[in-house]
UniProtKB/Swiss-Prot annotation:
Its EC number is 6.1.1.20. It is an enzyme of class 6 (ligase). Gene3D superfamilies: 3.30.56.10, Bira Bifunctional Protein, Domain 2 (3.30.930.10), Phenylalanyl-trna Synthetase, Chain B, domain 3 (3.50.40.10). It comes from Methanocella arvoryzae (strain DSM 22066 / NBRC 105507 / MRE50). Its main location: cytoplasm. This is Phenylalanine--tRNA ligase beta subunit.
Length: 553
């Protein structure tokens, strides 16, 4: 969950009608947000982190304007070309590959609106931007930027100097990471990188993303024109973050201008306000919610939730998703908003027609027992997404793509384009995201992996695995084998456990073995190779094992 603190009088002004605070709190609760705190005119709401569009006064005002039918659906801000180009140099690709942005003019800042913008910026960093690693926003005074060609480059840390925000000292990039408070907080994002990303104009550097901006382009109450730039590891993420910021400024009357983002191999026109369509059947909505709504009923409810309905038949609707709703991934997400607009409190509870008694499956009980054992062995439990990037499973693990992975035809992002075939890459993601934390880092996961199998009815075989990684200075084969032996002993399988020498591209030759229970191969154990560790940016040794949990029955 995330929190958003807003000024209540400013919110009412943005909504356009006089609403009591109690009424706002009531509606916010119905729509899934609770009131966390009230201090005078300052009200803090708790919102789910997937609703990044609600992390500002403007976002909440926009939602309430639609809910009260002041402005149903959504509109696309009129875009005009700015004449600015954002040129991406090829050397940034291994450092921080993506950038996007826009020009905003006719901004009329007040104390509240500038505070709201900065608040939104930081909330996006902490949620959607994954603490600036996946995406980060930079806001600049356009009048201080020289020239109409802006360059996104990567340079050595000691090659350029600038005066960062919250400082009067001329500093190199390395100095910023070592001594500036923001550099200390966020230097882990660039850990292991040989070059540092910068954004420059005709006068030189004015942004060190995702760390801090230059003092030269600082935004003040007297700023009327803005450059919004975002950098990150995923283009879709930063495009959505940009849209959220732009729609907030648009609600306050600003004008949006496009820029050309010139990559070495293509040119993108940003912002991208293209609308996605989702087809939804009336019967599907009613089956999920247990209601008897008609197509016109659903259309009216969706418009109150900020959607547009492009086409309606007697049994279907074509729904247009706003450019800032990154959380809408499936038609069930649309149904959820129908339910919120209808009011879940207005749905009459009923007992299912077939009575039954719920209980844990044997597989779930086994998984829980394994978790308890691994925790007792001093390892920390992790829960990772079953979707992962192909590069994480194959490229970074030094493995050839054998064609057995289940690929997603329309992935949310490149980091989630296949179903994982192993748990170890998921654990490596956790380790690579925690390079700034103390060691040892001994973690494990019990979870599902999958691969294509024509013998299965679905064409896919799913298997529950347990995997463990040890990451510290003395982590080695013997240390990880002790964990494996202790796990097997706890389930009465120690006498059947065998580790047979094997070769595997992810592991160091001579320090890798197959895990066998009886005569059946059920897993792998060993020390990860330096090639793998380097690809993840990990400098500590890592030892790991992974096996099927069914072998412990």
């Amino acid at each position: 969950m995330a929190t958003v603190t807003l000024n209540y009088p400013d919110l009412v002004k943005l909504i356009g009608i006089d609403l009591s605070l109690d009424k706002v709190r009531e509606v916010m609760f119905e729509l899934g947000s609770e009131t966390e705190d009230i201090q005078g005119d300052e009200v803090t709401f708790e919102v789910t982190s997937d609703r990044a569009d609600l992390l500002s006064e403007e976002g909440i005002a926009r939602m309430l304007r639609a809910y009260y039918s002041i402005e149903t659906g959504f509109r696309i801000p009129k875009l005009q070309p700015s004449g600015y180009k954002l040129i991406v140099n090829r050397e940034v690709e291994p450092v921080r590959p993506y950038v996007t942005g826009a020009i905003v003019r006719n901004v009329q800042f007040t104390d509240e609106s500038i505070k709201s913008l900065m608040h939104l910026q930081e909330k996006l960093h902490g949620t959607f931007g994954r603490k600036r690693k996946k995406g980060a926003v930079g806001v600049h005074d356009l009048s201080k930027i020289k020239g109409r060609e802006i360059h996104y480059r990567a340079v050595p840390g000691d090659s350029v100097k600038f005066v960062p925000l919250q400082s009067d000292e001329l500093m190199t990039l390395s100095d910023v990471l070592a001594r500036h408070p923001k550099g200390i907080d966020y230097r882990y994002v660039l850990e292991g990188k040989n070059l540092m990303p910068i954004i420059t104009d005709d006068e030189g550097i004015f942004s060190f993303p995702p760390i801090i901006n230059s003092k030269r382009t600082e935004v003040t109450l007297n700023t009327h024109d803005l450059l919004i730039e975002l950098t990150g590891e995923d283009l879709r993420t930063i495009d959505y973050m940009l849209n959220i910021v732009l729609y907030s400024l648009d609600l306050r009357g600003a004008s949006i201008y496009s820029i050309d983002v010139v990559y070495p191999d293509e040119t993108l026109h940003r912002p991208d306000f293209n609308v996605r369509n989702i087809d939804i059947e009336v019967d599907y909505v009613n089956r999920v919610l247990g209601l008897e709504l008609t197509a016109p009923d659903i259309k009216a409810l969706l418009e109150r939730m900020g959607f547009k309905v492009a086409e309606t038949g007697s049994d279907y609707l074509i729904v247009e998703v706003p450019p800032y709703r990154a959380d809408i991934l499936h038609k069930r997400d649309v149904v959820d908003d129908v339910g919120r607009a209808f009011g879940y409190n207005n749905i009459t509870p009923s007992y299912p027609n077939t009575p039954s008694v719920g209980k844990l499956t044997e597989a779930t009980k086994l998984g829980d027992a394994i978790r308890n054992t691994m925790i007792g062995l001093g390892c920390q439990d992790t829960f990772n997404f079953i979707l992962i990037g192909k590069d994480e499973v194959f490229g970074k693990m030094n493995l050839p793509d054998d064609g057995t992975a289940v690929e997603i035809s329309n992935p949310y992002a490149e980091q989630y384009n296949i179903v994982r075939t192993s748990l170890i890459p998921s654990l490596m993601i956790v380790l690579s995201n925690n390079l700034h934390r103390d060691y040892p880092q001994n973690i494990f996961e019990v979870g599902t992996v999958a691969h294509l199998d024509s013998a299965e009815n679905t064409g896919v075989k799913e298997i529950d695995h347990v995997a463990c990684t040890l990451c510290y200075a003395k982590a080695g084969f013997n240390e990880i084998k002790v964990k494996l032996q202790s796990l097997c002993a706890n389930f009465g399988k120690l006498d059947e456990l065998k580790t047979v020498a094997a070769e595997h591209p992810s592991f160091i030759p001579g320090r890798c073995a197959e895990v066998r229970i009886g005569d059946k191969k059920v897993g792998i154990i060993g020390e990860l190779s330096p090639v793998v560790l380097k690809s993840w940016g990990i400098e500590m040794p890592v030892a790991a094992f992974e096996m099927e949990i069914a072998a412990l029955k």
